[in-house]
């Protein structure tokens, strides 16, 4: 449409210029013909009228041509502006058409991008799970390392405590061995003292028996020193079973019980026991039997003395009369102790 309008404007312009040229040519021909006619018989009035009429027509045509030229220039400028504007529009339309043609490819690329984004999301989720697993593994490794450190510390602590325990046991064993040696030494001393005491008592009884011919215990002789406690301790040692001396608590209980029993037995072997002992009397044997017993007792006493010197823990040989006295005294003490226990139980129940 614009091209046809431009072609028309160009054709009008060409026609206008060709018309102006033809008018100029005609005016020249008219001048030439006037000159020719003037030579013949010029009529100045008619020529003047024709000239004025042609000049007026020419002036009007020239003015119209100028107006048309100006209007054509305006139209040409507007047409140029319109052509530039429409050229821009056409370029934009072409670009829009190209973009519209590229829409399917863009949609395909967009679908590919969405698929790749979905794959990336899945990969990110998987990576997150792997990172969580790695974090758990790192925590487990830290925990195992901490456990190893703690176990090493515990082993070192156990070793130190075991060494301390071994040292403490060694000290206790040494102390216990020393106490056992001291106790054995004291027991040996007590046994020797008791043996000496019984030998003296036996010699006195034998002298009385040989001089009088009979043996009657009138009263209980007073013990020399702390012989009552020694007798009770030896009797208890003879009655008790063997214990494991490695146990310190059992040793303490044994020593405490021995001291308490000594304290209990020493006051009880007083006038009450002497009443029971005073009633004991022995029948007088014959002279042959007496000599036989004396020889046997002397041999046994010498044997026991030699054994005590070698071993230090063998029991002392006693006479029959002394055994009877000790047994009766112990029986009386046991009866009184049982009665006191019963009374204590009754008192505790009443309380």
From Swiss-Prot:
Keywords: Coiled coil, Cytoplasm, Cytoplasmic vesicle, Endoplasmic reticulum, Endosome, Membrane, Nucleus, Synapse
Membrane topology category: Peripheral membrane protein
Source taxon at top rank: Eukaryota
Biological processes, Gene Ontology terms: actin cytoskeleton organization; anterograde axonal transport; anterograde synaptic vesicle transport; neuron projection development; neuron projection morphogenesis; platelet dense granule organization; positive regulation of neurotransmitter secretion; regulation of dopamine receptor signaling pathway
Main localisation: cytoplasm
Keyword check for Repeat: no
Subcellular location: Cytoplasm; Cytoplasmic vesicle membrane; Cytoplasmic vesicle, Secretory vesicle, Synaptic vesicle membrane; Endosome membrane
GO cellular component: axon; axon cytoplasm; BLOC-1 complex; dendritic spine; endoplasmic reticulum membrane; endosome membrane; growth cone; melanosome membrane
Disordered: region residues: 291-325
Coiled-coil spans in chain: 106-179
Family as reported in the entry's similarity comment: Belongs to the dysbindin family.
Name this polypeptide is given: Dysbindin
Originating species: Gallus gallus
